[in-house]
Amino acid sequence: MKQTPIDPKLIDSLVGELGINDFAKATIREVKLVAARAEKQSGVEFIKMEMGIPGLPAAKVGVEAQMKALGNGIANLYPDIQGLPELKNEASRFVKAFIGIDIAPEGCVPVCGSMQGTFASFLTCSQADSKKDTVLFIDPGFPVQKMQLQVMGVKYETFDVYSYRGERLGEKLESYLKQGNICAIVYSNPNNPSWICLNEEELKTIGQLATQYDAIVMEDLAYFAMDFRRDLSKPFLPPYQPTVGRYTDNYILLISGSKAFSYRSEEHTSELQS
């Protein structure tokens, strides 16, 4: 047996203790719990990447701006129902600077965490057309999103992208879309937990099929610009963060401020709609 840092028997016993039938299908929280117990029992430290916790020091300009806003009494007010113009305008500018596409400020919707953004988006997509009652996930993805659909009573389909990269993706995707019941297509790019990135051709395929079959793409950009094979950090200069938004008008982008800016704060996630 190959030597590993952690005895496989320890992991197997922990998986059994926690009642996990198939570890390959374990949730993020289950994986974290197994890792925490294995770390405690073995004394071997784990590098934990499963929860996507920011961790880097928050930008000074953000901290100072938040303190100033609190000092000016913002904490006792609800924001305008149309959204704070400064935030919506800057969100639009951010998208132009780092994704290279145009989204009007009216289409930039600040939400209390990406989970709230996906919940609201699922509600909208699943009720837009009575004939389209199913959400399609290009996995692996965020298990909580499927739990949200279960709470709503919305059906979903799923397939693992691993075996359908490149040209094979279009055929697989169309096999679902041509049934006529798919209201939305969901994926994350860069992907957590597999850390793969869909390329421009794959995004083009998704976008064109979404237009053809009138489905809405929900592109989760929680790990925004974290494909470090290219420098995506220069505003208003290519290369930009890849997005399906170049290939269809039927899309919603979900950008996590806590991850993109390492600024957890009171939640600064934006939902961006074309």
Residue spans for each PLM region:
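Glycine-rich "substrate-gating" loop/helix at the edge of Rossmann-like oxidoreductase active sites
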Residues: 19-22, 194, 257-259
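Residues immediately C-terminal
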Residues: 223-224, 260
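Conserved core of the PLP fold type I
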Residues: 71-213, 218, 224-248, 252
